Amino acid sequence: MDWNRVEGNWKQVKGKVKEQWGKLTDDDLDQISGSREQLEGKIQERYGIERDRVRRDIDDWYGRQTWNW
């Protein structure tokens, strides 16, 4: 997984993140600013899911995306 590309294209990616994890606020997404660690933490906070599960969910989500860099 090349998370650096996600960080570099965060403005385009955050809409897809919001579709998947609708409990994340626009402020959350701005704070995350492409950081995977921040994304994991916010998802864990908003959904009350264990960190390992969050990591798997992000990996699954990432693998399903079609990126148009």
Specify the residue positions occupied by each region the protein language model found.
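Intrinsically disordered, low-complexity, hydrophilic segments
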Residues: 1-69
